[in-house]
Design a protein with these regions (language model features):
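Membrane-interfacial helix-loop segments of redox and metal-homeostasis proteins
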Residues: 3-177
Length: 177
């Protein structure tokens, strides 16, 4: 009877482990796509509120709850375009939600690649988004003294995207070893 012990220099082919890995990465990719779509939808609503508040005096958005919980007031502040960092009439002085939409679309696109280098790029973009979230949250709390549920929603979405990218990175690292 033949010995079925694998050769010492050959790795054992474990279909279950490979299938489990692929399902994990596929589920993470689905999560990134769904979270990214949610980010695009929230950003679209943000743009709607911003444009409506600027064009119609007295406009009250659904996300305006109280005196210090008004997303329309936050979204028409000086920090709502180009993060308040660029001079007026600059080519890049667009609403922050446009940058957010671009970020979410890039994250969705990058999720189609199961490559460690691409996931590292996602992590870099996620780090930039989290730094931006901290900056905007600081402005929201300490400068504007307001609360914006739509803004906070984007912070949560960005944190979820970061978590998913970290999970994918971890899975791809395990695969390489």
């Amino acid at each position: 009877m033949a010995d079925r012990t694998p050769l010492p220099h050959c790795k054992e082919f474990d279909l279950h482990t490979i299938f489990q890995f692929n399902m994990g990465v596929q589920n993470i990719n689905r999560g990134v796509v769904l979270t990214g779509i949610l980010g695009v939808l929230v950003s679209a609503y943000t743009l709607y509120v911003e444009m409506a508040a600027e064009s119609r005096p007295g406009y009250k958005a659904l996300c305006d709850f109280a005196e210090h919980a008004s997303c329309s007031r936050v979204l028409t502040s000086e920090f709502s375009k180009a993060f308040g960092l660029l001079p007026k009439n600059s080519a890049f002085e667009v609403p922050n939600c446009i940058y957010g939409t671009l970020f979410y679309c890039i994250m969705i696109f990058l999720s189609t690649y199961d490559n460690i280098a691409v996931v590292r790029l996602q992590l870099l973009l996620n780090a930039a988004s989290l730094i931006t979230c901290v900056y905007l949250a600081y402005l929201l709390i300490f400068v504007l003294h307001d609360f914006c549920i739509v803004c906070v929603s984007t912070y949560v979405i960005n944190a979820c995207l970061t978590y998913l990218s970290l999970k994918k990175h971890s899975l791809l690292n395990k695969k390489q070893k």
